[in-house]
Regions:
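Extracellular carbohydrate recognition and processing domains
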Residues: 84-122
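Aromatic, loop-rich ligand-recognition surfaces of beta-strand-rich domains
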Residues: 3-84, 115-161
Length: 161
């Protein structure tokens, strides 16, 4: 289930199979996905659920970055991951590509993916953004990444024109 917009915001943090969460596919770390918040805001807090410790933790994140932008024009970073089923092929997108495309780094978080079910953290003063990019830099086993549920909190909300 590599469809973050369908699964990560359904208020269900219980892992019940790969189809009910985001799975990056194998050989895709580091990798990223982008979401549209629908409003421009300043992120202040995040809570991210991943696979529980009683289950397989190898795909749980150990480091993530959150990036933001106010618009999506010229925001693409290359190369684009190609996937066939659960196999992903490409080389990782370097940080310089994110910066050159106008993405602003909001936060970097080290996560205990092997020893906990979720991470909750405050986000220091961040730039305003509508488009948020989650970049999973590393995972417990380094092959793939899984998220079950996410919650983001922001200060202020400016609707689109």
């Amino acid at each position: 289930g590599a469809n973050p917009s369908e699964y990560l915001w359904d208020n269900n943090s219980f892992w019940s199979g790969d189809s009910n969460g985001y799975h990056s596919g194998e050989n895709s770390v580091p990798g990223h996905f982008t979401i549209d918040l629908g409003v421009t805001t300043q992120l202040t807090k995040a809570k991210i659920h991943y696979r529980p410790t009683w289950s397989f933790v190898g795909n749980n994140p150990t480091e993530i970055e959150i990036w933001g932008r106010e618009n999506i024009e010229n925001a693409e970073t290359y190369p684009i991951f190609e996937s066939l089923g659960n196999n992903v092929t490409s080389s990782p997108v370097p940080t310089s590509e994110f910066e050159n495309a106008g993405w602003q780094l909001i936060t970097i978080q080290a996560i205990n993916g092997g020893g906990s079910d979720f991470a909750e953290f405050d986000i220091p003063e961040a730039p305003m953004g509508r488009y948020i990019r989650f970049r999973f830099v590393s995972t417990v086993e380094g092959n793939a990444c899984q998220f079950i549920e996410m919650a983001l909190h922001g200060m202020g909300a400016i609707p689109p024109n």
